[in-house]
């Protein structure tokens, strides 16, 4: 009968007096088994005991990160690897760090291919003007607006006036701070901050005066240093009033709370000898703008940095390779360009520019970068901006940003190593970045003699994916590519001759591009307003006259505002 019940209802569950006891015993045995398993289990990663580094596949990397729908909208990295420019799709920023020794092809294998693609707006540092000559005609044919800031031959330069990007008192202080930092030698010993603050007070007073009181054509560094030439200081006579003092006194009578008046008052608190030292220091720092050719290219502005993110536009900054004394002007340009792009994006486009902007900084270490460069690297992705840092070795980054060099490297999701250098720091850096792999080794032992024997041992050991010696001897035609979160790959450098737009460039036998500036400035420095309108006509008091007579003349002085 029991067998018939089981046959008719094989899944029927019956309850007996032993059911509960059996369940408890079963649970107890199950718990003991789990405890025994975890107590005896070891932390094992077979084949990865000494490291899990391995080489990736260029084909797989390209399949994952290339923008296949818009094949022209990619960053060219190696012969077989592209990176899409839409960060929301790739989840990687457009910041690329390119490291390669002299002759490794940083310009040929990275800069030129990406400029020839003509798929975004560009801000380019161009030593020797090589990139402009090679790519200018192509960009012009593609409908680009090409602008050039030429420190090699200023007569062929478009205008860049830093005053055109001053929109508030804060911008004035930022510009002065950038000017001072970019014209101070990198390894200069720190001076008393008093002198620097005094110089800032004087410079800011003059800039704020020009921005608020002078016509737009007079708002430039040439006018500023012209004004500074009249900041006479008599060490032996604290009561002496220079023409510049008279100018600010006239402004104070009209607008006592003017910020320029307040800044000038800070400067005037310095004693005669101290004030003279401040004036001399400030004048020497601005001496560049006494040179006619540099004064001319900074009189008016033709760059319009904000439009880089709105239309196809390329700005080339040409710097001489044998003289870096004027490169601080490019540093100022970069600072104001980033400010203008961020401001335009926030004001008009909800924080993201419609046209991608790539900043290709060849010879990055030769141009003073903005003080906030690490922050710009960290935030530019959301604004649709990508920074491409091109250096000969990692030590150049450490020299400029000793405390923040790791942050700069870390904010570049892509690193391209082109080889061609013997600098130990860079070689060690690449070796550590590649990591270590686990290898299976076999050792054999042989004992000869009457009772000879042989043994074979199998074991695992760790090894760098590439040693320093192997990195140093990397094939000239190959590069090592790192993309954040991916295995490194070795691939051939890009073949420039296979670029689809090569025929329109100098490398494709086209004629070199010769830039024609927008036109020579038609502005000649007029006299300044207020006291400067008739400065040469003033009859200044001889310092040997009695002190009470000097004070009387000062008291009666009124600037002629009707001229």
Q: Model-derived features: where do they sit?
A:
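Short, small-residue-biased leader/transition segments that mark boundaries at the very start
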Residues: 2-6
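Glycine-centered structural positions embedded in regular secondary structure
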Residues: 1, 73-78, 176, 180
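P-loop NTPase motor domains
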Residues: 92-385, 400-403, 410, 461, ...
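Membrane-interface segments at the starts/ends of alpha-helical transmembrane spans
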Residues: 7-23
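Conserved ATP-driven motor cores of ASCE-family P-loop NTPases powering translocation/secretion/packaging/pilus
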Residues: 377-480
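Canonical hydrophobic alpha-helical transmembrane segment
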Residues: 19-34
